[in-house]
């Protein structure tokens, strides 16, 4: 049975989209590995190669989606959408340790480094999210989204303290250093 690899990007971020990708490879692609271990330039090259040589589905949830229905529900809905897109003919492997009660999905810790289809999904999810962050960085350059990628770095927290939140931020995420910052958007 062919494998459909699934991974996500943007799970633990304060800002930006949550992107979930599912990939079924039609042919071998050299250089597939965990997207975090690949340069952005190489990720873009692999993204294009995967899109040409694989069946794939990318599901994106905005910060507002994550705030409205919650991270776990977004992840569950994304997994279900990928499962519905590909159907019953594949074995589904998701990077991590929980399948969010989606029974047909098997989980595997470090699958993004071990299973080429999951590596490909990792690359699609990360490259898609990075494109979203370019939009955020153009609109709000003072936040430095391209440097911290939406994570809770010191520079990102300082930017929120100075400028407040934007529509790219997840307002339901609690960070001690931001406890007294107004949730009104920039």
Give names to the regions the model predicted:
Residues 1-186:
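RNase H-like, Mg2+-dependent phosphodiesterase core
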């Amino acid at each position: 049975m062919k494998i459909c690899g699934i991974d996500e990007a943007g799970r633990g971020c304060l800002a930006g989209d949550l992107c979930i990708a599912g990939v079924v490879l039609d042919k071998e692609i050299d250089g597939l590995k965990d997207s975090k271990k690949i340069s952005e330039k190489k990720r873009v090259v692999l993204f294009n190669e995967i899109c040409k040589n694989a069946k794939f589905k990318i599901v994106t949830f905005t910060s507002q989606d994550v705030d409205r229905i919650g991270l776990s529900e977004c992840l569950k809905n994304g997994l279900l959408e990928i499962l519905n897109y590909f159907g019953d003919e594949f074995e589904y492997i998701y990077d991590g340790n929980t399948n969010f009660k989606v029974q047909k999905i098997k989980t595997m810790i470090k699958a993004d480094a071990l299973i080429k289809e999951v590596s490909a999904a990792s690359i699609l999810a990360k490259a898609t999210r990075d494109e979203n962050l370019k939009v955020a960085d153009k609109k709000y350059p003072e936040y430095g989204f391209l440097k911290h990628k939406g994570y809770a770095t010191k520079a990102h927290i300082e930017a929120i303290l100075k400028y407040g939140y934007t529509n790219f931020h997840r307002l339901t995420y609690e960070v001690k250093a931001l406890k007294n910052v107004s949730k009104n958007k920039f």
